[in-house]
Amino acid sequence: NVRADASYQAEGGARDMPYNQINSVPLEGNAENSDRLRSTLSATRLGLDFKAPIADQNLNAKIEVDFLGGANLDNLRIRHAYLNYGNWLIGQTWSNFATPDYIPETIDALAYVGASIKRTPQVRYTHKFTPNTNLVAAVEDPKDASMSQRMPAFTGRLNHKFNDALSISGRAMAHEKRIQNQEEWAYGVGVGAKFDITPVTSVKADYYHVKGDSSFVSFTNPGVVATGTSIEQSEFDSITVGLTQKFNDKLRGTLAYGYMTFDKNQDYLDAVADDTKINKNLWQAWGNLFYSPVQPVSLGVEYVYGEREAFAPAANGSKKGEDNRVNLVAIYNF
C-alpha cells in the first residue's frame, strides 16, 4: 500500500515523527514539545507472496518491507521475510508471544500502551489438536539491544476458537538476559480475546505480565539494569481493551484504552542514573473513524490522550508528562 500519516501534537514527544512516544514524553514544565505538525510516508509497504507446490503441499513465502527503519524511522527495513511449509515457519514475522491479533484498531503505526508490534527472526512449529485449537511453539531472536545474548527466547501460544464470534489466545515467554558475566531469566505471560457482540460490533482485549524483558511489549522501562554485582529486573502488567463499531460498508470506528503499571523495585531504581525516565504508570485512550469512499482507499482520523507518571520528580517537582495528539492517515491498498 501507499500510506501517508500526519499528526498535530498539542503535547507530546521530542522525536520528529507522527507516532507514539508516550514512554518518553517530557514531564510538565521541562522542555515540553507542543504545537507541532509532523508527517511521513514511511509506513508505506511493499510486498510479494510466493507459492510453489512440493509433494502434496505448497511451499509459501512472503517478503514485505516498509521505510520505518533506522534511528529516524526513514530507512528501508524488512517487516516480514519467511518460508512456510506445512506446520513449519522459518524467517521473520510477528512474534509468537507478542502477537498483534488482539490490539484494538488504531491509526498510529507504533500502536499504544499495552500493545506489541514485535517481529522477530524465528523457527516456529504449529500443532493442531482440533480444527479450533492449536499450539504454536517457537524459538525467537528478540534482538534486545540492551544486553548480550547467547540463547534465543522460547515462546508458546495456545489458540482456541469457541465459535465464529469468540476466540482466545494464551502465551508464554522465557529468555536469558546476560550483562557481562551476570545472568537472569526473563519471563512473561499474556492472554488475549476477541468477541463479536453482533456482526457489526466487536471487542478486543489483551493482557501481559512480564518480568525482566523490554524487547517484546512496547513502551516499557528497560527490562534489566546491572548494579555491578547483580542484575535487577523491571516487572510490569499491561492491558488494552477496545470496542469497534461498523456503521456501514464505508464507515467504522473504535474507542479504546491502554494501561501499563510497573512494580517498584528500589534496587532497580538505585541502579538507574535518572529515575525521571523510569515510568511508574502509563495510560492512553483513543478514538478513531475510518472512511472508505471507494474500495482501495481508506481515510482515518484519530484523537489520543495519554499520560506517563515517573517514579521520580523533575527539578520543578513534576512527575507527569502528557501525550495529546490528532492523527490523520490516507491509505491506498493495491
Where do the protein language model's features map onto the residues?
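Outer membrane beta-barrel
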Residues: N1-P18, S24-P142, S148-T155, N159-N163, ...
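Outer-membrane beta-barrel translocator domains and adjoining extracellular loop/strand segments
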Residues: A10-R15, N72-I78, P100-I107, P142-P152, ...
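Residues that define the transmembrane beta-barrel architecture of outer-membrane proteins
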Residues: D35-T44, N75-R79, I117-P121, R150-F154, ...
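Transmembrane beta-barrel strand/turn architecture of Gram-negative outer membrane proteins
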Residues: D49-I63, S169-H175, A186-T198, N288-F290, ...
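Transmembrane beta-strand segments that form the barrel wall of outer-membrane beta-barrel proteins
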Residues: N58-G69, L135-K143, S167-R178, R252-T261, ...
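Membrane-embedded beta-strand positions of outer-membrane beta-barrel proteins
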Residues: A61-I63, W88-Q92, A137, L158, ...
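Detector for outer-membrane/organellar transmembrane beta-barrel domains
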Residues: G156, H160-W283
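Outer-membrane beta-barrel "beta-signal"
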Residues: Y291-P293, K320-F334
